[in-house]
C-alpha cells in the first residue's frame, strides 16, 4: 500500500507571513489539525494545533495576541516530506521515529497531499481480528473539571499526549484535547482585554473548555468500527470503557499508527 492511497488532498496552505489568527481560523472552519506554510509557493513549514496550544499559553502571547503574531514565529520549519509512492509502513515509521503527526506528500515541486496519523485509520479499518482492549493505551493520565486549563495544557505538552479524559467522582464527564486547548485559548486571547488576560487565563478551568459528553468506545469493540468512527468524526482520541462502564484506557491516532507499522 502506498501513501497516495491514504493521503488527504488537496492540502490547506497559507503564507508563512500571514497572521497566526488566519491559521487558527482555517483550522477551525475546516476541522483540520495542521496547515502547510509556504513562501513564494515553496514549503517552508508546518503549523499544528500543538504549536498553537504551546504558543497560546505562553506569557509572551498574553501581550501579543494571534492577530499580531505571524505563522513563521510558531510553525515548525523545514518539515519532513514523503513522495506519493512511499509505502505506508515507511510513513508510519517516520512519524513514530520523529514524533510527528503529519507529512506533506510531495511529487517533484508539487504538493500532492498530506498524510497524518489519523489517515492510518483507513488501514486499521481492515483489521477485523483486533479488539480495542488489545491495543489501547491503558491507565491514561486524567484531569478534573476543576483543574486549570494551564495545567491540562502543560500535561498535554510535557507528556506529548493527544487528549486527557476528564474525571469527576470516579466518572468520565468529558475529554480535553490539544485542539480544545488550542482553539479555546486562541478565542479567549482575542476576546479578553490585555490588562486582564494573564489573570483570566490562569483561572480558566478544564470544565469550561472540555468536550462533553465524551464519545467513548469499549474494550470489546472491534478496531475497524472504531477506526471508521475516528475517521468520520475526526476524533484524535477516544476514551475506552470496560464492560462495567469504567474508564480503562484511551485509543488515539498514535495507536493506529503503531498498528499500521506492525501489520503492514
Where are these regions (language model features)?
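Short active-site-adjacent helix-start/loop capping segments
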Residues: 43-46, 55, 83, 90
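The conserved cystathionine-beta-synthase
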Residues: 14-31, 38, 81-99, 106, ...
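Short gly/ser-rich anion-binding loops that grip negatively charged ligand groups
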Residues: 42, 64, 78-81, 85
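Tandem CBS (Bateman) regulatory domains
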Residues: 1-10, 48-78, 92-93, 111, ...
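A glycine-centered beta-loop-beta connector
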Residues: 27, 35-50, 95, 103-118, ...
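N-terminal coiled-coil initiation/transition segments in long coiled-coil scaffolds
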Residues: 44, 68-70, 87
Amino acid at each position: 500500500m502506498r501513501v497516495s492511497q491514504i493521503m488527504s488532498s488537496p492540502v490547506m496552505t497559507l503564507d508563512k507571513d500571514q497572521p497566526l489568527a488566519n491559521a487558527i481560523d482555517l483550522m477551525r472552519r475546516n476541522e483540520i489539525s495542521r496547515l502547510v506554510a509556504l513562501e513564494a509557493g515553496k514549503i517552508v513549514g508546518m503549523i499544528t494545533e500543538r504549536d498553537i496550544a504551546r504558543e497560546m499559553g505562553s506569557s509572551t502571547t498574553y501581550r501579543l495576541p494571534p492577530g499580531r503574531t505571524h505563522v513563521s514565529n510558531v510553525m515548525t520549519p523545514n518539515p519532513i516530506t514523503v513522495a506519493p509512492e512511499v509505502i505506508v509502513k515507511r510513513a508510519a515509521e517516520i512519524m513514530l521515529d520523529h514524533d510527528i503527526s503529519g507529512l506533506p506528500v510531495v511529487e517533484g515541486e508539487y504538493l500532492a497531499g498530506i498524510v497524518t496519523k489519523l489517515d492510518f485509520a483507513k488501514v486499521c479499518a481492515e483489521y477485523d481480528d483486533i479488539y480495542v482492549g488489545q491495543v489501547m493505551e491503558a491507565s491514561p493520565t486524567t484531569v478534573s473539571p476543576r483543574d486549570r486549563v494551564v495545567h491540562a495544557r502543560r500535561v498535554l505538552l510535557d507528556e506529548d499526549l493527544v487528549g486527557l479524559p476528564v474525571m469527576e467522582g470516579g466518572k468520565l464527564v468529558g475529554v480535553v484535547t490539544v485542539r480544545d486547548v488550542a482553539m479555546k485559548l486562541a478565542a479567549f486571547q482575542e476576546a479578553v482585554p490585555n490588562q486582564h488576560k494573564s489573570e483570566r487565563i490562569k483561572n480558566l478551568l478544564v470544565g469550561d473548555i472540555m468536550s462533553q459528553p465524551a464519545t467513548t468506545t469499549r474494550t470489546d469493540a472491534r478496531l475497524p468500527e472504531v477506526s471508521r468512527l475516528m475517521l468520520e468524526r475526526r476524533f484524535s482520541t477516544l476514551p475506552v470503557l470496560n464492560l462495567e462502564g469504567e474508564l480503562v484506557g484511551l485509543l488515539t491516532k498514535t495507536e493506529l499508527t503503531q498498528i499500521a507499522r506492525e501489520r503492514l
